[in-house]
Amino acid sequence: MKTLSIDIETYSSVDLAKCGVYKYTEAPDFDILLFGYSVEGSPVQVVDLACGEMIPAEIIAALTDTGVTKWAFNAQFERICLSRWLR
């Protein structure tokens, strides 16, 4: 795997616009609800984490693999949210 495109949908009771991404992700109820991904431009797969679906192990591994280029529309937000979620 050389490239991974990602998009997430999240929830937090903290107002993102007022408090910023770090406070948003530090809220006890912060969660990633949906995780969309595409490997090497393949059709997009959506994982419904809110309903108990699991992100495939190879995708989790790719998130921390420095040899895989990650793409996201709001990369800094996605990076911070995923870093918090992966703890």
Question: Model regions: which residues?
Answer:
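Conserved DEDDh/DEDDy metal-dependent 3′-5′ exonuclease domain
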Residues: K2-S5, T10, D15-C19, E26, ...
